[in-house]
């Protein structure tokens, strides 16, 4: 059993996508809200399944719940088809590329629903790339829905101390501070440098 600290990278995903959108959003005609939603929505299905799994075992069975989440992420996450599909339909690079191909006709149709969804998929792609690079052996399934098990083995894990999680915490914190400065410092300086 790996000692899992309580980690939540959703804020980092959101900050990274917001910085990308600020720098490149106008140039590549991204729908801002869609791109930002794409930074956080991929993790929601797994979160909901995990909560449901815990609630079920805690309140509707007589089984001991100690270690239940280790079972969830040690067995269900890797082997249960529902868990795999739920987590990867917005994480797998293969399925995201398929979505982008299907939606590509909307790339220049700004303001349409199709353009919004294409921007959302681009946001999910950024999320997926970050997850692939920051999960030792539990990142997105690369070729889902064609293959349900192949994952990239990153040398770094944002949560696993055996794979530099303690060091990565500081890298992630630094990235967030720099990007938050990029996002908000110019507005802050402008606001307080106006003559009264």
Regions found by a protein language model. Give the residues of each.
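N-terminal membrane-targeting hydrophobic helices
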Residues: 2-196
